[in-house]
Amino acid sequence: MARIALKVDVDTLRGTREGVPRLLASLERASAKATFLFSLGPDHTGWALRRAFRPGFLAKVQRTSVLAHYGLRTLMYGVLLPAPDIGREAASAMRAARDAGFECGIHCWDHVVWQDNVRRRDAAWTGSQMTLAFDRFAEVFGAPPATHGAAGWQMNAAAFRRIDAWGMAYASDGRGTGPYLPQIEGVALAHVQLPTTLPTLDELIGTDGIDAGNVATALLGLTEADRDQVFTLHAELEGGLLAPAFDALLSGWRAQGHALVDLGGLFAGLDRRRLPTLPIAWGEVPGRSGELIVAPVARAGAR
């Protein structure tokens, strides 16, 4: 039986307040586990409009109807409306995920600021952002986070090292084909990376005739084999208009015989000694604008 680890990125105040409760209900109906990764500071979603000048961004917006999924109010945060503090205004919604038995971790402090800046920032800036997120998580939950999953799959060397410094055993900060030990400047880090292996729904919708009505079928076609996977979903999407597609995925994965686990559940079944050691790299992913953290394909016998 293969395991599919479900990783929920929660980017916005609306996603935290509205999407998370809906996802909890869907997951509980399916007896599925998942890891919720929270944005813990200000919601500056409106600042993301600056990405309109990046190659591929407008095409993605047109394919996935950002306004319908995020709402006008969210798109005004940081532009025409002040940015709300998610960790202050929606702490109870975050704790509800933990109280329902779901693994919780850090997504970021400020989603837009992290995604748009971390690649070129230094260790001091990175440490400051991550410390803000860590401290707020501890304030909200009364305990340290279990794991980390970077906003927009954007990282730098200092961020990977900070995960080691926190003592986290595993994280999910990039894209790839399977678990690996990340290597920075020739040195293997202590934690295991569990990269997202499957395309997200918004990467598939609008391509090759795929829409919200058949996207679940398209994705299920990629999970027929008995192979572990990591799937990233978003509270704003699968916890909103794409909820029917997500429910169809949950049913389909059960029918395929897969176990639906959280990141911790996937990590628990790994033999660290058999994992490849791979350098951190950047690359493009179909349906996603810009470059992301990617794991090079492991060569046979790589360690």
Positions of PLM-derived features:
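Catalytic alpha-helical scaffold of carbohydrate-active enzymes acting on polysaccharides/glycoconjugates
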Residues: 1-147, 152-192, 210-231, 239-303
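Positively charged, amphipathic and often flexible ligand-engagement surfaces
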Residues: 193-208
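Active-site clefts of carbohydrate-active enzymes
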Residues: 201, 233-236
